[in-house]
């Protein structure tokens, strides 16, 4: 992908774009920050066959969900204040011990947290 492509993100000098319709919900506002080392962690989850979802933070302005090989990968928007970007929030995850492979989740943005509506 070339520099200047609409919607493309730069990572380590290369440009990437997620195809339209890939994410089930949420937004990708910056390139994710995966480790530079390959650890095969995700592949082990797929082999195990009993992982429903994995939740991640750190990427400051991303808040998406996507199912990859039967596992929901869920990125949560940043909650800290000593970083770039203006939007902050958190993710509520509701689990039912009787149905462990089903969950509900909702993003709470800082304006909703701080305006007395919650």
Roles of regions detected by a PLM:
Residues 1-59:
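His/acidic metal-ligating clusters that form di-metal
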Residues 26-27, 32-48, 62-118:
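Binuclear metal-dependent phosphoesterase catalytic core
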């Amino acid at each position: 992908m070339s520099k200047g492509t609409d919607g493309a993100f730069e990572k380590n000098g290369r440009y990437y774009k997620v195809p339209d319709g890939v994410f089930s919900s949420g937004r990708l506002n910056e390139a994710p920050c995966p480790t530079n080392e390959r650890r095969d962690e995700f592949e082990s989850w797929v082999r195990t066959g009993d992982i429903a979802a994995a939740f991640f933070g750190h990427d400051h302005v991303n808040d998406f969900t996507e199912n990859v090989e039967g596992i929901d990968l869920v990125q949560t928007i940043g909650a800290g204040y000593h970083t770039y970007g203006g939007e902050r929030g958190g993710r509520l995850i509701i689990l039912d011990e009787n149905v462990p492979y089903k969950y509900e989740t909702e993003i709470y943005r800082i304006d909703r947290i701080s305006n007395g509506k919650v």
